[in-house]
């Protein structure tokens, strides 16, 4: 199953689980987050001595904004709307978010910058991120 379909299935599951007494469901946003270092050789932050914190060192991170439609967020990444790349960001996520603090669970899609196409395109998420929630 594609990450795209997984995200749509997650939205459907979440909305069904969180219907209110009137049948109203929460609506998601699709947040665009980008960062500097996409390579698989990233190191972990080591705040005290040599003990890894478990947080990958991605360099600068920026939350660029969000859209209410997944397809619009993907198009913004693919077409580098408003120069999301800013000459320094080479990877990013589209994160599915619902209202609230400390998200109970998220679904996300990983993207890498493509110099030839001048946009971000879906890629396999590196193992180093799979235990980190953003």
Question: Which positions does each model-derived feature cover?
Answer:
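Short intrinsically disordered terminal tails
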Residues: 1-2, 20, 24, 127-134
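Short amphipathic alpha-helical segments that mediate assembly, nucleic-acid/protein binding
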Residues: 3-10, 25, 70
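Structural boundary micro-motifs
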Residues: 3-4, 16, 43, 59, ...
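Residue-level detector of alpha-helical secondary structure
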Residues: 8-15, 74, 78
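Short aromatic-glycine-(Arg/Gly/Cys) micro-motifs in beta-strand/loop hairpins
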Residues: 14, 19-62, 91, 95, ...
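Predominantly extracellular/luminal cell-surface or secreted proteins
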Residues: 33-37, 67, 114
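A short, charged, amphipathic alpha-helix used as a generic interaction element across diverse proteins
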Residues: 55-61, 67-88
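Short, mixed-charge low-complexity intrinsically disordered segments
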Residues: 79-134
């Amino acid at each position: 199953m594609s990450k795209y379909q997984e995200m749509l299935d997650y939205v459907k599951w979440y909305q069904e689980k969180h219907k209110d007494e009137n049948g109203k469901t929460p609506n998601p946003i699709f947040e665009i987050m980008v960062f500097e270092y996409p390579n698989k050789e990233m190191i972990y932050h080591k705040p005290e001595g040599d003990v890894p914190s478990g947080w990958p060192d991605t360099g600068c991170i920026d939350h660029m904004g969000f859209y209410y439609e997944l397809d619009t967020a993907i198009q913004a990444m693919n077409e580098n709307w408003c120069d999301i790349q800013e000459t320094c960001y080479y990877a990013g996520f589209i994160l599915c978010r619902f209202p609230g603090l400390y998200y109970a669970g998220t679904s996300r899609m990983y993207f890498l910058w493509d110099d030839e196409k001048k946009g971000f395109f879906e890629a396999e998420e590196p193992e180093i991120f799979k235990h980190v929630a953003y």
